[in-house]
Amino acid sequence: MKILIVSDTHRRDGNLREIIEKQSPFDMLIHLGDTEGSEAYFKEWVNNDNCVIRVVRGNNDFFSQTDREKEISIGKYRAFLTHGHMYGVSFELETIKEEARARKADIVMFGHTHKPHLEYCEDGLVVLNPGSLSYPRQDGRK
């Protein structure tokens, strides 16, 4: 299964469309918030009726009707999806990890910080932030 995981595109649709074109085909698109309205076009851009699309609302998605959080299955794994701002991810990750564990998730995915992060915890929890396609904040900004 091939999954495209993105976050914090902030209506810079060209960036997202470019990565969709480069990575297609894939089986699932996960967007971890701050689409700022672009989610209405995801199905059209992916152009694959078999692709599952999962989106959660970020702190800048003021008018979005999407859920703030989702729990989904990815094969045999249980994933907790959230934007992360409600868990203080800009300051520390322990709170979001505790929430993921309380939900019995194998993977927690979040955005908000605009910095990619991948961590494998001793108890097996995987912590993933894809960063931002539009406004990256990590060194090198790519």
Positions of predicted regions on the chain:
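A generic structural micro-environment signature
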Residues: 12, 41, 78-80, 87, ...
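Active-site neighborhood of phospho(di)ester-bond hydrolases with catalytic His/Asp-centered motifs
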Residues: 5-7, 28-34, 54-59, 80-83, ...
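N-terminal active-site segment of His-dependent metallophosphoesterases
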Residues: 1-50, 61-68, 140-142
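Conserved beta-sheet core of the metallophosphoesterase superfamily
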Residues: 51-52, 89-142
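Beta-strand-turn-beta hairpins that frame and shape the catalytic cleft
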Residues: 1-3, 71-80, 121-127
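Short active-site segment of divalent metal-dependent hydrolases/proteases
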Residues: 11, 37, 86, 115, ...
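Helix-adjacent hinge/juxtasegments
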Residues: 54-99, 103
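A general secondary-structure boundary signal
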Residues: 24-25, 41, 71-73, 104-106, ...
